Every structure is written in structure tokens, then in C-alpha cells.
């Protein structure tokens, strides 16, 4: 069985790591290269760097920051934000990214995901899904939750069902899915386990849970109840509540296979 992964996430805005609540109410959390270096030293399995306003501002992710980070960090680095064309992916990989996350562009041009995965290999293509719970639906007399995809850093609704979308992205060639619950983001109430279960039961690619971690138990729940392959967190690490080592030790104590 593959070891589960802990992935600290750096949301970057104007060259600084920030953390918000439900995609707003932003707080500064430091210089991205310094923050990444700290997590590298703590034993993070991977690091994710998301330029959270790149798509909305229609500008490219800062390659210079990625280059500096890649020189400092010796674990796989996933970079996303403003990725709209094949050249963007090539430039990020050349700058030192190991994987590239596609979000809004996948919604507008789904075939872009297939093209990217054919050109670079699906192991380095991550599709990021920002999902928000909307009105429940009735299926065969049972009330079921429904989640909708949002784009542009969670600013624009699409009307697309998130669970069906996750399946489509896996079929098109995504090597991994990064699923963020917008309802949970920054709330510290735990992952949306129902959303994670719905997606992990339908796809055969690794799923990363994101949005809502407030304690170490939430990380373990993502794996044990949500069925995910990796857990992503930000504020519990950024503001010193826990270290990555503490998180790994806790998860291992719950019987989860970890790289210690």
C-alpha cells in the first residue's frame, strides 16, 4: 500500500503567502520561499504553491518565485494559478515545478487537460477542483447533497456538478485531483468528508483533500473516512499550531501508513 502524503499548501498573493476563510478575509503568512523551506525541513511529502489571484488578474504565475522555491525545496512541488495554455505548463516545469495544477482553464477548455497529459505525462497534471455545496437533490427518494464547481479563485459559479466533473477530469487524463471544499476553507471544522467519499468512490486516480483542517484528527479523517490519498493543509502549519512531523506521527498512530 502506498504511503499517504501530507502536503502543506502555500496560497500566494502578490508574492506573499496568505490564508483566508472561505476564500476571503485574507491574513499574511510570510515569504513563500522561507515558508516552503520550513516545510521541506519538517519532512513534508510535497508542497503545493497556488497563485490565488493569477487567473482572476489574468497574469502568469510568478516563475521567479517558483525557481527560488525549487532551489530550496527537495520534495515534489506542485504549482498552479493562471495556467491557461501548454506554454504555461512547460514554463512552470522548466522553472522547477514537478506537477502543475489546472483549475479554471479545465472548466473552459476540458480538452486542455487531455492535451497536457499527453504532452507531459499525466503524472505531472493535477486538476484542482473548488467545490461548494449547493441545494440538495432527491435521488430515488433519498436527499443527496450536491456540490458545484466554482472558478477564478472561487469567485465564479459554473453550474457544473463537482462529482461528475471529477470523474470527467480523471477520464480526460488528470493524474491527480486536488479537491477543495469552499465551505470548509479556513473554517477549521474538518474536510467535507461526504464530498471526498463521493469523489474517491468514483475515480481511480489519487485524490488530495483540501479545505477545513483545524486539528490533526481532521487529517486522519480525510484518509480513514474520506478515502483520500493525500491531505493538504495550510493554516494549522502556517501559524505554528502543528508541525508536519507532529501530523505524520499522529496519523501513523492511527494506523495510517506514512513516510516518517
UniProtKB/Swiss-Prot annotation:
The keyword Amino-acid biosynthesis is assigned to this record: yes
Pathway annotation from the record: Amino-acid biosynthesis; L-histidine biosynthesis; L-histidine from 5-phospho-alpha-D-ribose 1-diphosphate: step 5/9
EC number: 4.3.2.10
Enzyme class of the recorded protein, top EC level: lyase
Residue numbers annotated as active site: 11, 130
Gene3D superfamilies: Aldolase class I
A GO biological process held by the record: L-histidine biosynthetic process
Top-rank taxon: Bacteria
Catalytic activity: 5-[(5-phospho-1-deoxy-D-ribulos-1-ylimino)methylamino]-1-(5-phospho-beta-D-ribosyl)imidazole-4-carboxamide + L-glutamine = D-erythro-1-(imidazol-4-yl)glycerol 3-phosphate + 5-amino-1-(5-phospho-beta-D-ribosyl)imidazole-4-carboxamide + L-glutamate + H(+)
Assembly description: Heterodimer of HisH and HisF.
Family to which the UniProt record says this protein belongs: Belongs to the HisA/HisF family.
Protein name: Imidazole glycerol phosphate synthase subunit HisF
Organism: Psychrobacter cryohalolentis (strain ATCC BAA-1226 / DSM 17306 / VKM B-2378 / K5)
Amino acid at each position: 500500500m502506498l504511503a499517504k502524503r501530507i502536503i502543506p499548501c502555500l496560497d500566494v498573493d502578490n508574492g506573499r503567502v496568505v490564508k483566508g476563510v472561505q476564500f476571503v478575509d485574507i491574513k499574511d503568512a510570510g515569504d513563500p520561499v522561507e515558508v516552503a523551506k520550513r516545510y521541506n525541513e519538517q519532512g513534508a511529502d510535497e508542497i503545493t504553491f497556488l497563485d490565488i489571484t493569477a487567473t482572476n488578474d489574468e497574469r502568469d504565475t510568478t516563475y521567479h518565485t517558483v525557481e527560488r522555491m525549487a532551489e530550496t525545496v527537495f520534495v515534489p512541488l506542485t504549482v498552479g494559478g493562471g495556467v491557461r495554455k501548454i506554454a504555461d505548463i512547460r514554463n512552470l516545469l522548466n522553472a522547477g515545478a514537478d506537477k502543475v495544477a489546472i483549475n479554471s482553464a479545465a472548466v473552459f477548455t476540458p480538452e486542455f487537460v487531455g492535451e497536457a497529459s499527453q504532452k507531459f505525462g499525466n503524472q505531472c497534471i493535477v486538476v484542482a477542483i473548488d467545490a461548494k455545496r449547493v441545494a440538495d437533490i432527491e435521488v430515488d427518494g433519498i436527499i443527496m447533497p450536491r456540490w458545484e464547481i466554482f472558478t477564478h479563485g472561487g469567485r465564479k459559479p459554473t453550474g457544473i456538478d463537482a462529482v461528475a466533473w471529477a470523474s470527467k477530469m480523471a477520464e480526460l487524463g488528470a493524474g491527480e485531483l486536488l479537491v477543495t471544499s469552499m465551505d470548509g476553507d479556513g473554517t477549521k471544522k474538518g474536510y467535507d468528508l461526504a464530498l471526498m467519499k463521493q469523489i474517491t468512490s468514483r475515480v481511480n486516480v489519487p485524490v488530495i483533500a483540501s479545505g477545513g483542517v483545524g486539528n490533526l484528527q481532521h487529517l486522519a479523517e480525510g484518509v480513514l473516512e474520506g478515502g483520500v490519498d493525500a491531505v493538504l493543509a495550510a493554516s494549522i502549519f502556517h501559524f505554528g499550531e502543528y508541525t508536519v512531523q507532529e501530523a505524520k506521527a499522529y496519523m501513523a498512530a492511527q494506523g495510517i501508513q506514512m513516510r516518517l
